[in-house]
Amino acid sequence: GCGKTYHSAQIILGLLKAGKRIGVSSNSHKAIINLLHGIEKAAERDNFRFSGAKKSDPDSPETMVNGCMIRDVGNKKDISSDDLLIAGTAWLFADPLFEETCDYLFVDEAGQVSLANLIAMGVAARNIVLIGDQMQLSQPIQGSHPGESGNSALDYLLKGHATVPADRGIFLDTTWRLHPDICEFISQAVYDGRLHAHHDNAKQSLLLQSAAHPGLKEHGISFISIEHSGCSQKSEPEGEIITEIFASLLRQNYCDRNGMVHAVSAENILVISPYNVQVNYLKSILPEQARVGTVDKFQGQEAEVV
């Protein structure tokens, strides 16, 4: 929640205004489309228009950007030299057709982009900008890779640093998402103490009724100890407590960072488990509208209660 997409879109917009040709890529179409939407919004705010193209699959709606300035093309040969912005996965930029055709290549979620893929598509640009957080989930890997060849692009660049050094990049140090009590723990545990919460985030809190579940707090991190044994991938005792907390949450209100009060709904809650067996069990006992999944399903998403 540090404005990665917003800042990236602003930088790309500035380069487009300067007449630079931009490439946008990532491991997934979802990540690419999210950044493209941010770029179009930034351009619309500034009344700036440009022509762009994204390599998509007409038979897969989830790959389509459906933009007002960035059109979808099924054939990469339909990308024109007039397109100041081109977007696609590594398969697009690794094609010799696009060698040295971009001034800048922006790679989103670079913590999940393999070094090999970056090298393959890097020939398309004179400059490469990596965007992401190597402390999030790493790239899925199958097989054995010698030396550092199995690293992600960000892992290779940062050489073990938890946060990017000033001489290698920009660290966005303000979260617009986390309450200060949560941010303090995350910052010290993961980000060298460099991450800080915006002051308005302190307004975010649950407005708990007197009968609320005792495991709930107005804000911050709550730990509930549950005694059980032999539950390596599925825990019914944990499921029972989660069901009670979920039901209690739906009877509460919350205050957002703007000071507005809302009723808690299932949309405001994320339930996360490391095991698919437990996820399936939780889905079977929680209301149908509950958002339940493993970490990889919800990475990058947010909710008032997790």
Stretches found by the model and what they are:
Residues K41-A94:
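Inter-Walker segment of RecA-like/P-loop motor cores
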Residues H7, I11:
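Hydrophobic positions on the alpha1 helix immediately C-terminal to the Walker A/P-loop
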Residues G3:
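Conserved glycine(s) of the Walker
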Residues G14-G19, S26-N34, G38, A90-V107, ...:
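Conserved helicase motor core of SF1/SF2 NTP-dependent helicases
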Residues R21-V24, F50-S51:
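Conserved catalytic segments around the Walker B and adjacent sensor/switch elements
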